[in-house]
């Protein structure tokens, strides 16, 4: 980072020096000067074909240059004004509701502003005076059309259909690209963009370029829109947006978009670390300054709500960092979308679309070399945090490429200089800016990062609209707003727990279970017979933030209380929906006992509703795993509380390597680092990979010869106190969360780990599969943190937080 900063400072000096020498200052360029006033132009006679006027009647004619008042009338510029106070909100007559401007600067990575805000005085003032996030997370793939349309709809790409800048749809038998006329076919564009939400509810919307806005989606366009033309100067775009705000009330738009291609165009050509990027950033900054000056000239600078954001970031690339498919296949006989987010499909479509050997391609790209700069996935196996599987347009073969690398067909590929984007949205280089200013937003406010799927709901709130269904979590950005329009309501539990009373000891012959080390079976079983006081104490210890609520209809389950853990045992799937426990910094672990050595039926569960040990035969690839690790108990005798069939779940033998190391090594490590953890874990069933829990009818279709359904994933939610002086049980302030959705697969080929020790790969693997608590909720039908006393919007912030583990390359 220090080297980067030194390089940039040098580039700044060179750039500014060249600027002075080569006449880059606007005051020297007649064309640039025509967009602004000067003392010489003040009071000028009207001239034909001038881009804006500095004549004495320009205010009356509404064609003044945006800086007319500051240059010709001696008023202070917006840039030199102090930040508006909370009492300074003002709108001129005729503006009963604040207009909303959504301004996108393409490819403006958050790191540009983090490091070089002093070079961008207008953007820096917006950041200082308004609300800003350290960064906004783009959706995957981090491409232009994908993210702009997600911002407009609040939908993941798999939901709105624009899954990349280049797409093939087998049902339409059409190809989509940015330059093709087919991109204007409404069949590509799903969801309800914000301009339609506005017009459907009586407002007017105007778009000066936005992907999708020139398409007749659902039979209509925005009230006003412009067909894309990249040759139109940025100043002309700003001028037109300001003219829209000058329209009579009956015609004036309430929602407006503005888009500029910089710094993306320059980033692609020269890369994100270059003197040219500095010029592009300063050009973008001047464009914002022109807009704010124009708003102030209309007394709208404290009336309009403005959101300034980007679609994605930018990463440096090199022709020395390419992975060639020709090095993995003798004959590259398939179609490949090349670059930082590659996909592979059949060349012969639609004929071979469904019969293409996607699994064979992934297998041939997995663990082929000691060091590969990509991982190959079937779309259904991609990290759930990406939400990139549930659409026929998403090809089944996907490559997740390392930072600064690209995967391509062969050496004919030449677009490998400068910069690009499209990578994993957790990479720091892909992070985008988010700034907001206006009477609707809090002042001088920095907020934690969030995902761009949340912006649609935020815009609806500012415009007092009811959002269309979307993937955002409504209310999670209320802390950005001065007076939140929407108040979220707590989820309502759909299925309450049943009773599973302590019963007689069943015959061991029923289960096939054995445990020769138990000499006093009745005494061991009586430990499961907790009285009400003991249950209350267990809940205080093991469920400090409330019991996970079941939002699935007609779910039959009961709560099982033990001293050191609590579980919700499902009679539908014959395993726990969840298990919850709390461990401390000092919790010690030992080698977990083998279930085949000691396991017995839970006397609280009728035999007909219980798993049996005979379900697990030695020749099967499935083995019983524990949700609550028995070795977390403090004595061998207490371990018997967990060596019961109600605590086991079916796991592939290969997966138990990851699961056991996670629980015996990593969870205790995290507990030491965070002064204790509350742990909730359980199974996930998502066979149709739509990101939502499967119905029980669907689950039953995937019962194999073990007679129990096999989960597609397992989740783990680790919660601690943000103030690590406190343990999870005495935490009065904000909470901190780490959550994971781990694919349940028969092998560990994702990590090329069949022979590697667990300490070399398990932690990296689980970090790849980090997730939001909200993702876990959607996949399980559970509602977490129901017992928190804090306002619900604060809980929603916690649920939508995504941990980041990726170390930046630059």
Swiss-Prot record:
The keyword Transcription regulation does not apply. It is found in: Secreted. It holds the Pfam family Phosphodiest. Residues 1-23 form the signal peptide. Binds 2 divalent metal cations per subunit. Glycans are attached at residues 175, 218, 229, 364, 471, 553, 633, 704. A divalent metal cation 2 binds at residues 106, 144, 311-312. InterPro entries: Alkaline_phosphatase_core_sf (IPR017850), DNA/RNA_non-sp_Endonuclease_sf (IPR044929), Endo_G_ENPP1-like_dom (IPR001604), ENPP1-3/EXOG-like_nuc-like (IPR020821), His-Me_finger_sf (IPR044925), Phosphodiest/P_Trfase (IPR002591), Somatomedin_B-like_dom_sf (IPR036024), Somatomedin_B_dom (IPR001212). PROSITE patterns: SMB_1 (PS00524), SMB_2 (PS50958). AMP binds at residues 230, 268. GO terms for cellular component: extracellular region. Its EC number is 3.6.1.-. Disulfide bonds join 37-42, 37-54, 42-72, 52-54, 52-65, 58-64, 65-72, 83-129, 91-303, 319-416, 367-752, 500-558, 513-613, 515-598, 721-731. It catalyses: ADP + H2O = AMP + phosphate + H(+). It is an enzyme of class 3 (hydrolase). A divalent metal cation 1 binds at residues 264, 268, 421. Expressed by venom gland. GO terms for molecular function: ADP phosphatase activity; metal ion binding; nucleic acid binding; nucleoside triphosphate diphosphatase activity; toxin activity. PANTHER family: ECTONUCLEOTIDE PYROPHOSPHATASE/PHOSPHODIESTERASE, ECTONUCLEOTIDE PYROPHOSPHATASE_PHOSPHODIESTERASE FAMILY MEMBER 3. Belongs to the nucleotide pyrophosphatase/phosphodiesterase family. Hydrolyzes ADP with high activity. Shows weak or no activity on 5'-AMP, 5'-GMP, 3'-AMP, ATP, cAMP, and cGMP. Is devoid of monophosphatase and proteinase activities. Dose-dependently inhibits platelet aggregation induced by ADP (IC(50)=0.99 uM) and collagen (IC(50)=1.4 uM). This is Venom phosphodiesterase 2. The lineage of its organism: Eukaryota, Metazoa, Chordata, Craniata, Vertebrata.
């Amino acid at each position: 980072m220090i080297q980067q900063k030194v390089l940039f400072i040098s580039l700044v000096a060179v750039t500014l020096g060249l600027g002075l020498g080569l006449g880059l200052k606007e005051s020297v360029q007649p064309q640039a000067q025509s967009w602004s006033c000067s003392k010489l132009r003040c009071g000028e006679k009207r001239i034909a074909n001038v881009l804006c006027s500095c004549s004495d009647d320009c205010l009356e004619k509404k064609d003044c240059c945006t800086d007319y008042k500051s240059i010709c009338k001696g008023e202070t510029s917006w840039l030199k004004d102090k930040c508006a106070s909370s009492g300074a909100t003002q709108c001129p007559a005729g503006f009963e509701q604040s207009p909303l401007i959504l301004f996108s600067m393409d490819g403006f990575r958050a790191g540009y502003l983090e490091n070089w805000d002093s070079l961008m005085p207008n953007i820096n003032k917006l950041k200082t005076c308004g609300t800003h996030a350290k960064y906004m997370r783009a959706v995957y793939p981090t491409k232009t059309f994908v993210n702009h349309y997600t911002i407009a709809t609040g939908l993941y790409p798999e939901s709105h259909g624009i899954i990349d800048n280049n797409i093939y749809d087998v049902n339409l038998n059409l190809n989509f690209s940015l330059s093709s006329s087919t991109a204007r076919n409404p069949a590509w564009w799903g969801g309800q963009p914000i301009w339609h939400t506005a017009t459907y509810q009586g407002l007017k919307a105007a778009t000066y370029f936005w992907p999708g806005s020139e398409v007749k989606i659902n039979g209509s366009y925005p009230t006003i829109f412009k067909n894309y033309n990249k040759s139109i100067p940025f100043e002309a775009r700003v001028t037109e947006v300001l003219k829209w705000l000058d329209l009579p009330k009956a015609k004036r738009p309430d929602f407006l978009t503005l888009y500029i291609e910089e710094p993306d165009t320059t980033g692609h050509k020269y890369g994100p670390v270059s003197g040219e990027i500095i010029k592009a950033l300063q050009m973008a900054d001047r464009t914002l300054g022109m807009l704010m000056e124009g708003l102030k000239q209309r007394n709208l600078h404290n009336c309009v709500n403005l959101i300034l954001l980007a679609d994605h970031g930018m990463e440096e690339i090199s022709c020395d960092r390419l992975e060639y498919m020709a090095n993995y296949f003798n004959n590259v006989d398939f179609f490949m979308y090349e670059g930082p987010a590659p996909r592979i499909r059949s060349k012969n479509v639609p004929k071979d679309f469904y019969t293409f050997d996607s699994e064979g391609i992934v297998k041939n790209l997995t663990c082929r070399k000691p060091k590969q700069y990509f991982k190959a996935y079937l779309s259904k196996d991609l990290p759930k945090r990406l939400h990139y599987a549930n659409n026929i347009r998403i090809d089944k073969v996907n490559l997740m490429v390392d930072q600064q690398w690209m995967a391509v067909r062969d050496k004919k590929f030449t677009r490998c200089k400068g910069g690009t984007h499209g990578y994993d949205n957790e990479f720091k280089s892909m992070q985008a800016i988010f700034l907001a200013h206006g009477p609707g937003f809090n002042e001088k406010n920095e907020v934690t990062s969030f995902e761009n799927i949340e912006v649609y709901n935020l815009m609806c709130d500012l415009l007092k609209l009811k959002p269309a269904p979307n993937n955002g979590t409504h209310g999670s950005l209320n802390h950005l707003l001065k007076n939140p329009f929407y108040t979220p309501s707590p989820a309502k539990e759909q299925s309450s727990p049943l009773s599973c009373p302590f019963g007689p000891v069943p015959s061991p012959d029923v289960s096939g279970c054995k445990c020769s080390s138990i000499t006093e079976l009745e005494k061991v079983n009586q430990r499961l017979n907790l009285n009400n006081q003991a249950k209350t104490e267990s809940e205080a210890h093991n469920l400090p933030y409330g019991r996970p609520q079941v939002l699935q209809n007609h779910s039959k389950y009961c709560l099982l209380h033990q001293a050191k853990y609590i579980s919700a045992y499902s009679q539908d799937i014959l395993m726990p929906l969840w298990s919850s426990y709390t461990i401390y910094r000092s919790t010690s672990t030992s080698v977990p006992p083998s279930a085949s050595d000691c396991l017995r039926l839970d006397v609280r569960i009728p035999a007909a509703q219980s798993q049996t040990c005979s379900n697990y035969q030695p020749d099967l690839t499935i083995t019983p795993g524990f949700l609550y690790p028995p070795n977390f108990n403090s004595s061998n005798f207490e371990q018997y509380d967990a060596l019961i069939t109600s605590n086991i779940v079916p796991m592939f033998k290969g997966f138990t390597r990851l699961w056991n190391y996670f629980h015996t090594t990593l969870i205790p490590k995290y507990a030491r680092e965070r002064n204790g953890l509350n742990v909730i874990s359980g199974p996930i069933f998502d066979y149709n990979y739509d990101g939502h829990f499967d119905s029980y009818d669907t689950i039953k279709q995937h019962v194999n010869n073990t007679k129990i359904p096999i989960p597609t994933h397992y989740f783990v939610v680790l919660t601690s106190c943000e103030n690590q002086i406190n343990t999870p049980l005495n935490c009065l302030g904000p909470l901190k969360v780490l959550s994971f959705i781990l694919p349940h697969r028969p092998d560990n080929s994702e990590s090329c780990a069949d022979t590697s020790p667990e300490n070399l790969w398990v932690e990296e693997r689980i970090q790849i599969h980090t997730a939001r608590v909200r993702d876990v909720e959607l996949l399980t039908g559970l509602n977490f943190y129901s017992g928190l006393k804090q306002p619900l919007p604060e809980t929603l912030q916690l649920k939508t937080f995504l941990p980041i583990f990726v170390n930046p390359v630059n």
